[in-house]
Amino acid sequence: MHKFTKVFFVAILVHTLKSGLVFTPVSGTAIDIDKDGKFADRITINHFQSDMEGYKAYTYQKEGDKYVNISKVFYGERLLKVGGYNMKCDYVFYIKVFWKGELAPFLIKLKYYSWSWAPYKKHFKLNPQLEWEEVFIPTIDETSETGYRRLFKQRMDNPFSLIGDDLLASYKPFKATKAEQVIAGTTEEEKSDKKKYVLMVVVVVVFVVVASLVVFLVKFCLK
């Protein structure tokens, strides 16, 4: 009986430690995005509705270069479908914009983070910089894209111009539905989650020790 009790509590402890790792970003690589799910080697993104709207586009390959298709979607939580699995991914940090022509306007690198655990790790990994390539049509006043279209048209006419550098450096196109995260530091929410799981581990360890002691005393008394 004592043997099975130890196995049971060890299993609980391992499960708790494993659950705690859900909140640990893992290393990995960037992803490619496929809007319609037609390519097996790309990732399909389905967006959950939120109160923040914007124009989003998806990358596709053409003669070795990346271009974009534009589609209006919602911001907020998203669900990444990786292989046969689904993964929630929260975001948002900053973007960089690159003009790619009249019909394929912007290519963007968007920083993000995710709280995920296996089996997703086998199919999708985050890198330490937490970056993923995505596209976005930015606007100066967040209600009209005219301003940025005009700005980038000027940049195209004069590639060496510094027009708009100040705007590009300071522009933040939207706010995440959850609090924005800071890559370099640990957020209060993250600290709180870590404390919660550390406390859980401590409680389980204490419980295992006490239970083992009780079993030992009972076994000793029965002798």
Swiss-Prot record:
<keyword id="KW-0812">Transmembrane</keyword>
<keyword id="KW-0325">Glycoprotein</keyword>
<feature type="signal peptide">
    <location>
        <begin position="1"/>
        <end position="19"/>
    </location>
</feature>
<feature type="transmembrane region" description="Helical">
    <location>
        <begin position="198"/>
        <end position="218"/>
    </location>
</feature>
<feature type="glycosylation site" description="N-linked (GlcNAc...) asparagine">
    <location>
        <position position="69"/>
    </location>
</feature>
<keyword id="KW-0472">Membrane</keyword>
<feature type="topological domain" description="Extracellular">
    <location>
        <begin position="20"/>
        <end position="197"/>
    </location>
</feature>
<keyword id="KW-1133">Transmembrane helix</keyword>
<feature type="topological domain" description="Cytoplasmic">
    <location>
        <begin position="219"/>
        <end position="223"/>
    </location>
</feature>
<keyword id="KW-0732">Signal</keyword>
<dbReference type="GO" id="GO:0016020">
    <property type="term" value="C:membrane"/>
</dbReference>
<protein>
    <recommendedName>
        <fullName>23 kDa piroplasm membrane protein</fullName>
    </recommendedName>
</protein>
